[in-house]
Amino acid sequence: MNMHGRRRGWSLMVSGGLLSAMVCAFLLSGCGKSSEAEIAPLACLAGPDAYLTALDGAPDKVELSGGTKISDCLVPRQSGGELATIGADLVAAATTLNSNAIDDPSGPSSLRAGYLLGAVEKAAWSSNGIHTDLVRRVSAAASYIPQGDDPSLLQPGFDQGLEAGRSRG
């Protein structure tokens, strides 16, 4: 093969590679636009204390600032960063409520922990599975019972809150 044949072959390979890359980029750019991340309300990013304050109204009126329900914080196609931030805040709030409920089982924290879990479950039902792990984490944090303690320690307040959160969360 002469020198021109090698150049021509190389030129076709480079052009073919560029064409393939351009087609892939075009197809991927179209895909990204149809599945853009949804954004949760700003009130959902106010930290765990905002959730704890809102839960003071459980089992009745539980709202973050601006009338935002806890279930509104978990949206379909949520970005990973936003989900991580909101998820950490929800788990922190659930952990605080659980600790308070263990210290005072007859107090309101058990009901509030149940409500929080119910609201997270409600949101997760319509989010195509992206919040499944968060539901498990909030459930573990909200319903934790230390080894050796009575498993019914948090009931019935927890169950009442759970049902309220699932329906009104």
Q: Where on the chain are the PLM-derived regions?
A:
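Extracytosolic low-complexity repeat regions of secreted or lipid-anchored proteins
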Residues: 94-169
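Terminal low-complexity, poorly structured segments
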Residues: 8, 14-15, 23-24, 79, ...
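Extracytoplasmic low-complexity, Pro/Thr/Ser/Ala/Gly-rich segments
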Residues: 31-95, 165-169
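Sec-dependent bacterial lipoprotein signal peptides
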Residues: 1-31
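Generic detector of short alpha-helix boundary/capping microenvironments
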Residues: 18-20, 61, 104
